[in-house]
Regions:
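Short, contiguous acidic/charged loop-to-helix segments that flank catalytic cores in large enzymes
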Residues: 5, 21-22, 63-70, 97-103, ...
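C-terminal catalytic core of tyrosine-transesterase DNA break-rejoin enzymes
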Residues: 30-33, 37-44, 111-114, 130-153, ...
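C-terminal secondary-structure termini that scaffold catalytic or DNA-interacting sites
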Residues: 18, 57, 85, 92, ...
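Well-ordered beta-strand positions in beta-sheet-rich domains
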Residues: 59, 70-74, 159
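Catalytic-site neighborhood detector that most strongly recognizes the C-terminal catalytic loop/helix
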Residues: 7, 64-68, 78-80, 150-176
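A structural signal for short hydrophobic beta-strand segments in well-ordered beta-sheet cores
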Residues: 51-53
Length: 191
């Protein structure tokens, strides 16, 4: 089957951000914001340790990544500011601690369902945040950079998922190009 292609529209993203402002669980709100901003997997966010976050160097080290080698997630100044604002707990290595602070929070499922309902996000699953961030990266910097940022093992994975999502962008560019050609053709034909 083709890969899931659901991404949040601009309007859905606005509704989600508004719902996040009212979210009572700070961990749910921060994890969702982090996933939407960086394209990280929710499990990566939940398992993040303070020792792996470099706020000055704007990077997040993933010590036991999916691909088997050390990987990094680039942080923007806005994401660093989000992380700086998180509470820290004595002797707790986790950004998002569980109730006893000995382990990280295991899930945000209930919180995500609450947020999706509040933002009226029909059919949206939490992994769609990663795809939404990925599409924004593709649009801003191309498939190659998005592939690296999302830490896909092969650029073909990125192309398979995001190329179909770019059809609207491609169509828009083709219409612009077509209009310029039509105008050029008309000028030549009118002479």
């Amino acid at each position: 089957p083709p890969p899931r292609s659901r991404v949040l529209s601009d309007d859905e993203q606005r509704r989600l951000l508004k719902a996040l402002d009212a979210e009572p669980d700070w961990i749910v709100a921060a994890v969702v914001r982090l996933a939407l901003a960086t394209g990280c997997r929710v499990g990566e966010a939940l398992g993040a340790r303070w020792a792996d976050i470099d706020l000055e160097g704007l990077s997040w080290r993933l010590p036991s990544p999916k691909a088997g080698n050390v990987q990094f997630i680039a942080l923007t100044p806005a994401v660093a500011k989000l992380l700086e604002g998180l509470p820290r707990f004595d002797d707790c290595p986790w950004l998002f601690p569980g109730p006893d602070q000995k382990k990280h929070r295991a899930s945000i499922r209930a919180g995500w369902e609450r947020l999706a309902d509040a933002a009226q996000l029909d059919g949206v699953i939490v992994h769609d945040l990663r795809r939404t961030a990925g599409l924004a990266l593709v649009r801003a910097a191309g498939l190659h950079v998005a592939s690296k940022a999302l830490r896909h093992s092969d650029a073909r994975v990125t192309a398979r998922v995001y190329a179909p999502l770019q059809l609207g962008d491609i169509r828009e560019a083709m219409v612009k190009a077509e209009k310029s050609r039509v105008l050029r053709f008309r000028k030549k034909g009118a002479a």
